[in-house]
C-alpha cells in the first residue's frame, strides 16, 4: 500500500492549483473524474467568466492564459434584467470570457509530473485509521488503496470529503441548469436575470464562440419546470433561443450563513466550493478556489502545531468576504430594493441608439 503526504480529491481550479504548488515539496497524489484531454467525460456546467479576483491570482502566480482557453467575444458589461419590474440596466464588468472545460484541463496540465495524477478516476471510499487517511479509488480499470497523512477535499458542491467529515451539515443547494443554442442575437451580450417568481437565486446568459448559453440556479425539486418557464418569459426582453444544442445540469451550493463555511478537521481540509467558498451574489467560485488553495499550501508547508486550526484562522478574511456576498445577495434578491437601485440609474451605462 503506497503512502503519500497529501491526497487531493478533485482537480478543478482549487485542487489543480494546490497540487501544482505542493509539487516537489511534498509527496502528492491527486484524483480527478475528468479526462486528461478532450471533450468526453465529465465537464463542469458553468457560464465561464473569469472574475477580476481570479485574474489577480494568476498575476501573483505569474501565469498567463493560453489562447485556446479564451472564448470569443470579450464582453465589458452585464445586462441586468428584473423580469417582474420590466427593467433592464447595463453595468460595467471586467470579466474574461473563457471556455470552462478547456480552462480546467489547462489548469491540470500545469501540475508537474512529480505529482501522481489519476484522470478519469472515481473515489470510492475514505476513512481515517491509525492517524492516516485511507482512500480507495478506481482508475485504469482497477481499484487501488492508498494512505495519506493529509486529505484534501477539492471535490466541489457534492463533496464526498465534506459529507464524511460533517455528515449532519446542511447547506442550501440549487440545481444549476444550462442550455446551449446557436447564437441568433445581432450583438452578443452577457446578462444577469432576476425573477423572484422563478428563483430566489438568479439566472444568466452568455454569448460564447458562436453559441448563446442560458442558465440559472433553481430549487432542486422543480428546477427544470422553472427553467422552462423563465425561458418563455425572456422573449419579452428580446432573448432568442431556437433548438437547444446541448443541455447541462449540476448541483451548486448557495451559502446563506456563517456556519455554511467549513474548513475540515482531523488533518483533512476543504478548499473551493467543497468548503462552501462560493459567492452567494454571483455564484462565482474560481477566485475563492484559487485563494483557498494558496492559503492551504502556505499552512501545509509551514507545518504549524495545529494545522486545521491554522487553516481556519488563515481563511477568516476569505470567509468574511464571502459573508459580505451573502448580505449583497439578500439585497439583490429583495424585489423592492433591487427595483429602487435599478430605477435610480446608479452605475448604469445607457447604450446609444442609432
From Swiss-Prot:
Protein name as annotated: Protein CbrA
GO molecular function: FAD binding
Family indicated by similarity: Belongs to the CbrA family.
Organism (species): Escherichia coli O139:H28 (strain E24377A / ETEC)
Amino acid at each position: 500500500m503506497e503512502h503519500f503526504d497529501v491526497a487531493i480529491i478533485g482537480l478543478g481550479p482549487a485542487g489543480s492549483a494546490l497540487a501544482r504548488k505542493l509539487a516537489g515539496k511534498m509527496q502528492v497524489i491527486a484524483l480527478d473524474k475528468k479526462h486528461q484531454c478532450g471533450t468526453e467525460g465529465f465537464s463542469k456546467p458553468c457560464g465561464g467568466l473569469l472574475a477580476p479576483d481570479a485574474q489577480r491570482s494568476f498575476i501573483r502566480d505569474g501565469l498567463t492564459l493560453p489562447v485556446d482557453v479564451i472564448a470569443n467575444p470579450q464582453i465589458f458589461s452585464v445586462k441586468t434584467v428584473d423580469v417582474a419590474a420590466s427593467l433592464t440596466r447595463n453595468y460595467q464588468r471586467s470579466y474574461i470570457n473563457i471556455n470552462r472545460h478547456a480552462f480546467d484541463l489547462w489548469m491540470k496540465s500545469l501540475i508537474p509530473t512529480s505529482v501522481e495524477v489519476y484522470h478519469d478516476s472515481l473515489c470510492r471510499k475514505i476513512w481515517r485509521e491509525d492517524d492516516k487517511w485511507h482512500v480507495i479509488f478506481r482508475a485504469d480499470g482497477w481499484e487501488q488503496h492508498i494512505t495519506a497523512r493529509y486529505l484534501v477535499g477539492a471535490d466541489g458542491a457534492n463533496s464526498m470529503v465534506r459529507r464524511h467529515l460533517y455528515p449532519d451539515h446542511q447547506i442550501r443547494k440549487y440545481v444549476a441548469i444550462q442550455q446551449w443554442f446557436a447564437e441568433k442575437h445581432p450583438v452578443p451580450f452577457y446578462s444577469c436575470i432576476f425573477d423572484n417568481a422563478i428563483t430566489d437565486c438568479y439566472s444568466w446568459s452568455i454569448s460564447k464562440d458562436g453559441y448563446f448559453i442560458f442558465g440559472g440556479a433553481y430549487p432542486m425539486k422543480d428546477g427544470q419546470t422553472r427553467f422552462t418557464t423563465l425561458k418563455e418569459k425572456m422573449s419579452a426582453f428580446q432573448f432568442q433561443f431556437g433548438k437547444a444544442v446541448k443541455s447541462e445540469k449540476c448541483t451548486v451550493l448557495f451559502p446563506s450563513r456563517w456556519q455554511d463555511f467549513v474548513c475540515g478537521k482531523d488533518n483533512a481540509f476543504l478548499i473551493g466550493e467543497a468548503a462552501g467558498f462560493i459567492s452567494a451574489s454571483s455564484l462565482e467560485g474560481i477566485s475563492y478556489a484559487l485563494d483557498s488553495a494558496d492559503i492551504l499550501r502556505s499552512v501545509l508547508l509551514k507545518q504549524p502545531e495545529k494545522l486545521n486550526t491554522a487553516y481556519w484562522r488563515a481563511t477568516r478574511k476569505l470567509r468574511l468576504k464571502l459573508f459580505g456576498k451573502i448580505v449583497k445577495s439578500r439585497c439583490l434578491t429583495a424585489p423592492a430594493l433591487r427595483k429602487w437601485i435599478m430605477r435610480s440609474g446608479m452605475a448604469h451605462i445607457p447604450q446609444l441608439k442609432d
